[in-house]
Swiss-Prot record:
<dbReference type="InterPro" id="IPR023434">
    <property type="entry name" value="Arginosuc_synth_type_1_subfam"/>
</dbReference>
<comment type="pathway">
    <text>Amino-acid biosynthesis; L-arginine biosynthesis; L-arginine from L-ornithine and carbamoyl phosphate: step 2/3.</text>
</comment>
<feature type="binding site">
    <location>
        <position position="177"/>
    </location>
    <ligand>
        <name>L-citrulline</name>
    </ligand>
</feature>
<dbReference type="GO" id="GO:0004055">
    <property type="term" value="F:argininosuccinate synthase activity"/>
</dbReference>
<dbReference type="InterPro" id="IPR001518">
    <property type="entry name" value="Arginosuc_synth"/>
</dbReference>
<dbReference type="Pfam" id="PF20979">
    <property type="entry name" value="Arginosuc_syn_C"/>
</dbReference>
<feature type="binding site">
    <location>
        <position position="126"/>
    </location>
    <ligand>
        <name>L-aspartate</name>
    </ligand>
</feature>
<feature type="binding site">
    <location>
        <position position="262"/>
    </location>
    <ligand>
        <name>L-citrulline</name>
    </ligand>
</feature>
<keyword id="KW-0028">Amino-acid biosynthesis</keyword>
<dbReference type="Pfam" id="PF00764">
    <property type="entry name" value="Arginosuc_synth"/>
</dbReference>
<dbReference type="InterPro" id="IPR048267">
    <property type="entry name" value="Arginosuc_syn_N"/>
</dbReference>
<dbReference type="GO" id="GO:0000050">
    <property type="term" value="P:urea cycle"/>
</dbReference>
<dbReference type="GO" id="GO:0006526">
    <property type="term" value="P:L-arginine biosynthetic process"/>
</dbReference>
<keyword id="KW-0436">Ligase</keyword>
<keyword id="KW-0547">Nucleotide-binding</keyword>
<dbReference type="InterPro" id="IPR014729">
    <property type="entry name" value="Rossmann-like_a/b/a_fold"/>
</dbReference>
<keyword id="KW-0067">ATP-binding</keyword>
Length: 400
């Protein structure tokens, strides 16, 4: 257990981080707890969260608007990387953690704090992401992790908090644990801990059910420049507005729900429900424009590195030499990723129905057509195939 006099706490307003405030003071001897809540576009009543921290005993309660850097510096690189952990989860929650941890360190430096703290438990991924990031950015700061060390059950944690006037937001009527930001929602706990039980419609908040989604399909064009999405249906937007538009567009049609078994960093499997309509839509469209503008060997290599990029981010290594090296590769690969992808949204599905790139398309109709315009030299195929298959013939000559 580390010791610190002034601590900056990553604060969400939930039970664990609220209980951390009196616990740090009573059990760790911390004199000043500075609560920091990040605005990531979640739409919470942040003023209420600020008041709640003070009520729980914080010396200061700070709110930081991180929406713009969250989307521009974390979400958009993930889109260019086609980042899907285990091929499915687009890291909507994981991407926020290194940004919050970085901000904790910055505030600690500004206010001359000698420690930082978080309320992550010992079973989750976030403890890893916070600890690894803080260790990479500020190994000299004391890192306090009361929720990992106090050994209280959920009921005991709530009872401890009630002694200090902390009211739990989770009840029998709402047993779910929900994390929300502009990229989407993650929902777990409660009835969802049974992986065979279908989630009820009440757990979803930003995607329509199939029954309630429009009965007519909608067509949308998404424009990419250097791998970045820059416009939807001809309307250019800055990144935050574009994500909001993509969320609205895809969510309305019931696209973006995930119900998956996920392998956590600590080695256990968990059942996770995600709503990430806009992010999944943009990744799908980005994959398609890449297929038109990048050569096969680059696509193949990038697809393998994308999985490694997603693994690094999921496991807390945003600020690592390998992640930085992969960023360099991905940035180079995106120079020619320019063009428009047309999608059809309908009843929970997004289908790509068109793609074009004026300057960078590697699709040449005169070479691909089977019509009279065909300019491909068919006679060259025979020699190519002979050389291409030569290793197989040599093997056969020697061994058969």
């Amino acid at each position: 257990m580390g010791k610190a006099n002034k601590v900056v706490l990553a604060y969400s307003g939930g039970v664990d981080t609220s209980v951390c405030i009196p616990y740090l003071k009573e059990e760790y001897g911390v004199e000043h707890v500075i609560a920091f809540a990040a605005d990531l576009g979640q739409g919470d009543e942040l003023d209420e969260i600020k008041k709640k921290a003070i009520s729980a005993g914080a010396s200061q309660s700070l709110i930081g608007n991180l929406v713009k850097p969250f989307i521009e510096d974390f979400a958009f690189p993930a889109i260019r990387s086609n980042a899907l952990y285990q091929g499915r989860y687009p890291l909507s929650t994981a991407l926020a953690r290194p940004l919050i941890a970085k901000k904790l360190v910055e505030i600690a430096r500004e206010l001359n704090a000698d420690g930082v703290a978080h309320g992550c438990t010992g079973k989750g991924n976030d403890q890893v992401r916070f600890d690894v990031t803080i260790g990479a950015l500020a190994p000299d700061l004391q890192l306090l992790t009361p929720a990992r060390e106090w050994g209280m059950s959920r009921e005991e944690t709530i009872a401890y908090g009630e002694k200090y006037g902390i009211v739990p937001p989770v009840s029998k009527k709402n047993p779910y644990s929900i994390d929300l930001n502009l990229l989407g929602r993650s929902i777990e706990a409660g009835p969802l801990e049974d992986p065979f039980q279908m989630p009820s419609e009440e757990v979803f908040g930003i995607t329509s059910s199939i029954a309630d989604s429009p009965n007519e399909p909608e067509i949308a064009d998404i424009l990419f420049e250097n791998g970045y999405p820059v416009a939807i249906n001809g309307e250019e937007m800055e990144p935050v507005s574009l994500i909001k538009k993509a969320n609205s567009l895809a969510g309305k049609h019931g696209f973006g729900r995930l119900d998956i078994i996920e392998d956590r960093v600590v080695g256990i499997k968990s059942r996770e429900i995600y709503e990430t309509p806009g992010l999944l839509l943009l990744i799908k469209a980005h994959q398609e424009i890449e297929s038109l503008t990048l050569p096969a060997d680059l696509l193949d290599t990038k697809s393998r590195l994308e999985r490694q990029w997603a693994d690094l981010v999921y496991k807390g290594f945003w600020f690592s030499p390998l992640k930085e090296a992969l960023d360099g590769f991905i940035n180079y690969s995106q120079k020619q990723v320019n063009g428009t992808v047309r999608v059809r949204l309908f009843k929970g599905n997004v289908d790509v129905i068109g793609r074009k790139s004026k300057e960078n398309s590697l699709y040449i109709s005169d070479m691909s057509t089977y019509g009279s315009e065909d300019k491909f030299n068919h006679k060259s195929a025979e020699g190519f195939i002979y050389v291409w298959g030569l290793p197989s013939r040599i093997w056969s000559w020697i061994n058969k």
